[in-house]
């Protein structure tokens, strides 16, 4: 099945890489500085920006709204609705209102992507999906997706009417965490769903001390983080949202899209970072263990 490419522009390697606003908007006193940071990311070449109503309690959306209101046609904006903000007695209405509030903060009349932030409260999924479908029909969102869903979650979600329109699934699929390669990635490919990774590369420093990763990076004159990201972007039907913490890191992450790993480099990385295809704990078992 053809992979959907929502939020993407015409340059494939650029299109596969987005900027996550996870660390934006926490403090109003930093809004000006963070606005400059986002403008710098745009100047580097980033065109996909992903927020959430929970990032800075809406602050990330506000910063993005100020920065990109005059550049709206040049960027792709997405946000996420949190299950914790959904009223169980008014699921549909809660999602619609949350979307409208995100649109207000983003200073736009539509989002390119709107995502369910996590898989809790699966009994509400049908109504959440109904809201997504109506928001899409009304032109308030261009596409919708899910986040932190494993293969079991996504399989259940896809049984719902209209779920075949799901465009993306966001996960923690990385070089250091390859479990999703066993089941979630094949499922996404079979359904034409784009798998987007949240590597949070700056948070995986221990993996970057690996001798094989460091050797490949040194041979190419780049950082281990760039090699790890290039590995991620080598997979068909996948993308990544990165979380830079400096302008230098922003540039380095964006430059990673130009790195084409050689077959022997991919083989060495795949051998070093094994793919543990173990039976997952079911959602029911996870809940029972809490």
Residue ranges with predicted function:
Residues 28-41, 90-106, 152-156:
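Short, acidic/polar
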């Amino acid at each position: 099945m053809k992979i959907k490419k929502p939020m993407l522009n015409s340059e494939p390697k650029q299109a596969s890489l987005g900027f996550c606003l996870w660390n934006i908007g926490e403090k109003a006193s930093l809004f000006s500085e963070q606005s400059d940071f986002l403008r710098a990311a745009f100047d580097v070449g980033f065109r996909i920006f992903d927020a959430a109503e929970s990032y800075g309690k809406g602050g990330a959306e506000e910063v993005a709204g100020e920065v990109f209101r005059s550049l709206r046609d040049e960027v792709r904006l997405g946000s996420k609705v949190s299950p914790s903000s959904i009223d169980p007695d008014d699921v549909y209405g809660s999602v619609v209102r949350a979307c409208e509030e995100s649109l207000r903060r983003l200073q736009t009349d539509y989002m390119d992507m709107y995502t369910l932030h996590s898989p809790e409260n699966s009994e509400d999924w049908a109504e959440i999906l109904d809201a997504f479908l109506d928001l899409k029909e009304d032109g308030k969102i261009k596409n919708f997706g899910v986040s932190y869903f494993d293969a079991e979650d996504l399989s259940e979600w896809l049984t719902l009417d209209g779920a075949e329109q799901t465009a993306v699934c966001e996960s923690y699929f990385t070089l250091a965490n390859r479990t999703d390669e066993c089941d979630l990635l094949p499922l996404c490919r079979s359904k034409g769903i784009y798998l987007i990774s949240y590597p949070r590369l700056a948070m995986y420093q221990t993996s970057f001390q690996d001798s094989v990763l460091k050797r490949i990076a040194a041979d190419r004159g780049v950082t281990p983080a760039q090699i790890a990201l290039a590995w991620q972007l080598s997979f068909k039907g996948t993308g990544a949202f990165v979380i830079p913490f400096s302008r230098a890191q922003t540039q380095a992450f964006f430059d990673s899209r130009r790195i084409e790993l050689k077959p022997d480099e991919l083989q060495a990385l795949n051998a070093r970072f094994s793919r543990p295809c173990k039976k997952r704990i079911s959602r029911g078992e996870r809940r029972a263990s809490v």
